[in-house]
Amino acid sequence: MSVDVFFLILPNMMMLDIVGPAETLQLAGDHFKIHYISPEASVQCSTGMMIGDLKPLPEKLPEGSLLVLPGVTNSLVDFDTEEALVTLKWLKGWREEIKRQAFNIVCICSGALLAARAGLLDGIQCTTHHDILDRLRALAPAALVKEDRIFIEDKGVCTCAGIMAGIDLALHLVHRFCSPQEAMKVAREMVVYFPRAGEDAQMSPWLRFRHHHHPVIHRAQDIIAISPEKNWNIEELAALIHVSSRHLSRLFRQHLGISVREFHEQMRLAIAQQYIQSGMGVEKASLVAGFSSARQMRRAKMRAEG
């Protein structure tokens, strides 16, 4: 079942704030169904390009959908325009649904200012571009504004720091609504240099060790990621990729700073954690992930945490 995603388009919105997240979600295939809505049938964006065939603001949003608020060029948000006033009135009508997390709000860059003016960020941990953090605090004094964050998700509200951070946040949404594997596939297709997570390292190791562009390492990582429960050894992996085991080991150390075994172990930990979070017992989850026992998994976790 696909997730409905509504991009709210207003005049002078940053094209990258729209197309960056939209293309990221679109590359996840049928998992997301994208809609473009606006108080106007067509608007001019930051580059001067006109966007037409925009649908009117809906009276109802589907349960579990995403409402995306892109940022405005140069963060010059004018709340007194006719479009802004209509939009704010519409957004305020969703406050109760947002509180019970009937759907999710996604703010790209200065889109957080629009959400703040509508009263949607009270009591919410949030962030925005570093140049307008003080303005966000002024508009939403009851919000918990955080600095030095790429993105934050709190109580169904997602906010992010700036233009390219919208892609990081969109990859996080693919990770959350689809799977780590799907997020990894999309990141690779976009050739995204991707060490960035939001406020934690929940995407690790699926994406944390994908910040390189070496095809040999990617092939080895893909093989391990597909079947992390298998007892892969470096000689077997090297043979499948048609390189020597010494060369493969050297590449992992050089580009990732870890060994093939360490990467494999962290993949198993990630799989086990997913099963545990879904309700599976620790012992069974450890076995399904490829560990010989829960005790071995705990030891691996201690090694990974240093």
Regions found by a protein language model. Give the residues of each.
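Extended, subdomain-level signal for the structured scaffold at the beginning of enzyme domains
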Residues: 1-105, 114-117, 175, 184, ...
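Predominant activation on well-ordered alpha-helical scaffold segments within soluble catalytic domains
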Residues: 19-22, 137, 167-171
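Structural detector of well-ordered beta-strand residues that form the stable sheet scaffold
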Residues: 105-106, 127, 146, 158
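Acidic/polar active-site rim loop that often engages polyanionic ligands
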Residues: 113-120, 152, 166-167
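A conserved active-site-flanking secondary-structure segment within enzyme catalytic domains
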Residues: 121-149
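Conserved anion/nucleotide-ligand pocket segment
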Residues: 149, 153-189
